[in-house]
Amino acid sequence: MLDICLLGCGGSLPTSDRNLTSLLISYNGRKILIDCGEGTQVSMKEIAWGFKDIDVICFTHYHADHVMGLTGLLLTIANSGRIDPLTIIGPEGLREVVKGLTVVAPFFPYEIELIELDSKCSDNFLDKVFKIEDVEIFALPVDHSIECLSYSVRVNRKRKFDVNKAKANEVPLKIWNELQRGKEITYENKLYVPDMVLGESRKGIKITYCTDTRPVDSLHKFAYKSDLFVCEGMYGEEEKKEKAVDKKHMIFSEAAGIAKAAEVKELWLTHFSPALSEPEKYLENAKEIFENTHIGSDRKIKIINFENN
């Protein structure tokens, strides 16, 4: 089971009912935060998921509406009692940005580990950038006015132990547990590997987050078969497409086009322009292309369960 909360859905500037952009993913006691705009920790306090277990913060890019909540959040994490290292991932320039944002708070009771990614826009996938237990984070360069990344968070599901397979392979009972945990074991001068006792691969969970970009073809494959695709819809109106092209953003129908091409299960629109006071008025522009589209809102929550297999 994986929990997702859209902490903030505003773009550019906060409004009376929208914090700036941020997405929180929680799985098995671990939390991943993508972007940290103003108001992030306010929403976190309201949903009461806790701060101490935030292990990774991923930045898409370094425009102010995506990073200005970091300083306060790091201080709150410190006050929560965290002492384990915290990892921050982002495009090139991460060290300079974090250094600037923490001038007023230079000391924390935990180490901050920084991972800077090559984020020149291209059609090539970046390799897996981070792994924590069963959760893997991937990144893809997209097309904004500055270097920007899209992120995909994938939860791998453990394969079931297959007793019949273990017996057929004549695996000694006393090493079953270690093989089930993924270890290779040499026993009585013979090598035993996990594949000798484990069943078929099982479908995991995939969440893809994309904001501040024009549509790029590589997103179709990157977001392919996502259980949830959280994508920017800066403007709802079709007539705003020219502005979206100029500002390197998307309109609702373009986000829906990516969702359809990627065959995702569900699309949440987010990162709305402050001028877009009623995004639901333009929802049909997206639903005509991809039916299972929803308007994002601050503190919108979804629980995704593994399929029964």
From Swiss-Prot:
Binds 2 Zn(2+) ions. It catalyses: Endonucleolytic cleavage of RNA, removing extra 3' nucleotides from tRNA precursor, generating 3' termini of tRNAs. A 3'-hydroxy group is left at the tRNA terminus and a 5'-phosphoryl group is left at the trailer molecule. InterPro entries: Metallo-B-lactamas, RibonucZ/Hydroxyglut_hydro, RNase_Z/BN. It comes from the Bacteria. Its EC number is 3.1.26.11. The active site is at residue 65. Zn(2+) 2 binds at residues 65-66, 212, 271. Its cofactor is Zn(2+). The keyword Cytoplasm does not apply. It holds the Pfam family Lactamase_B. Keywords: Endonuclease, Hydrolase, Metal-binding, Nuclease, tRNA processing, Zinc. Homodimer. NCBIfam families: PRK00055.1-3, RNase_Z. Belongs to the RNase Z family. Zinc phosphodiesterase, which displays some tRNA 3'-processing endonuclease activity. Probably involved in tRNA maturation, by removing a 3'-trailer from precursor tRNA. This is Ribonuclease Z.
